[in-house]
Structures are given as structure tokens and as C-alpha cells.
Amino acid sequence: MSLEMMFAYQEWPYRQTFKFARETREAAPLFVVHVSDGTHIGRGECGLQSLKHETPQSVAEQLRAMQNGFAGLSSREALNRTIPAQSARNAVDCALWDLECKRAGKSIWEIAGVARVAQIEVDITIGINSPDKMRADAKAAVARGYRLLKLKAHAQDALETVSTIAAALPGVRFIVDANEAWSLEQLKELAPRLKALNVVLIEQPLHHDNDAPLADYDSPIPLCADESCATASQIPLLAQRYDAVNIKLDKTGGLTEALALARAAREHGLGLMMGCNGATSLGNAPAYVVGSLCDYRDIDSQELLFEDRAGGMATRGGQLYAFDSAFWG
């Protein structure tokens, strides 16, 4: 039976202006993909990768090209064999997973062969701002039950930022996201001092094109690859430089490759973090599946939006609760 693919562009406003290392956003730019067999509809979602300079126009062009040639891409195997890892492929791949579940009358957990977990601990991201504003946001997050906070920090003010927040929140653990902006010298200076402040992970300290020196550096805090890591083929090299990898569906090009990446990372002794990219619960439902296999879960973007999709996942006390199969998968 032939399948039909449709897509639409949407913008979902954030609760407050969100500052990343590379940009500031008022809303999350997202694409929704529907794949239908005439009876069932599978849904998927993707965002934009600033690292790849993706724009709404470029992703729309990629989706339109896939739509026009969909007869040859209507299985996950064909899609992942033909289309490179990119955000557009993510939305289509996840829609095909959802459709497969609906046609088979089985859950994503059964189809993917992953044991269902009813809830998982997640962090919440504190965006770049003044130390006082970040401290206030961090205290508000802890008041809602979060015990693991992800702090985005430039090297020049990372110590001040983390010190200010840690002093106000004893016992809370932190992930520091450097977003490729540190030098090796700054990392060596900051890491021992951040360890004393209960920082448990440093994410992507060096630029992805200049992270080879990490192979010779024994960090007191585990280092996690983000921009350096997209697909399973990179794992043998990354295992020489990092202690963990951050999996994101837009980077892997969907759930299919994300599961392969998670397996490869574990086989090489790496820790796992599941991230997100401004998604609603529709984009983060497949992330939850991979997140159930991970040590850290940065699946919080739906909480940063002014509103989520109807029927989406709930977060209470720093725990993210599993989606219902009627919503996705």
C-alpha cells in the first residue's frame, strides 16, 4: 500500500526569551510530518540545527524533496540508507515508527525492543543570563523538584555562574554546557574547581573540529560530546576523547540511528545523555525511548515552551512521565 507524506512549519513560543551560546530565540521553529496509509497516520517532528546552518527554508526544501520521492523512502530502512542524518530525516523517521506501531497495533516499546519505563529523571536547562537571573531561575527549578540542572556558561564567567548557583542550592548536581566555546587551557583551569561545586558532567568544551587534544587530557569531570557526535560511525574515535555522548534526534536523523548510536556507545564503554532541540512532546516522545537507556536526560524543551501539544508528556518533581501510545508510538 502506498504512503502519503505531508509536512507543515510551526513556531512554538518560549515562556521567556531563551539564550543559547550561538543565538537567542523567542520561539522554537519546528516542522511536523504526517505519513498516512489512508487508514493510519504516523507523526514526527524536527527542529533546526544551528550548527548545520539549517533554516526553515532549507529544511522545507529537504522535506519537499523527500515528499516528491517518497515512494522510494517509505520504509525506515530505505530512508536511512538514502537520506543523510539531518533534522528533516528525523521527522520522517519518527513518523514512520509511529505509523508502524499503529498499523501493527503494538507500542513503540514492543516494536523497538526497549523495556518501557514509566518515568525518568530529567534535568532542566538554565539559559545564559546574568548570574543573579540564572540563580533565580535555578532556585525556581529546584522548588519544582529538579535536582539536576544544566547550566549554559561561557568560560569567562562559568566559575562565577556555577559558584553563585551552587552556593544557593546545596546538594543539587550540575551539568555545564560549554557549547564548544572553551579552550583546552580554560578547561584544565576550570574542571577541578567545577568538580568541587558538584558539576557531574561538562558538555562539549572544545570546538568539534579541534577536540583531538582531549585524547591526552584526563579530566576530573566526565566530558560529554555534543556537537562532535551525530551518528554511530563516529563512536570509535569519540571513545578516545570523551567519556559520554549526547544523543539528539535531529543530529542522528531519527530514532533509528539514535538507537544504533546508543548501542555503539555502550559497547565502547561510554556514558549516555539524551538531549533535545526545542521540541514539543511530539518530538520528545521518541527521545524518551532513547532516554530510558541513558544516564542523563536533557529532555526539557516542552517545559520551556509557553504551551505543549495536547496529550503531551507531564513533568513533576524532576521526573518526566512516559507518553501514552495514543499520543505517539
Predicted segments — roles?
Residues 151, 156-285, 289-292, 300, ...:
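Catalytic core of soluble alpha/beta enzymes
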Residues 10-12, 127, 228, 301-304:
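Residues that form or immediately flank small-molecule/cofactor binding pockets and catalytic motifs
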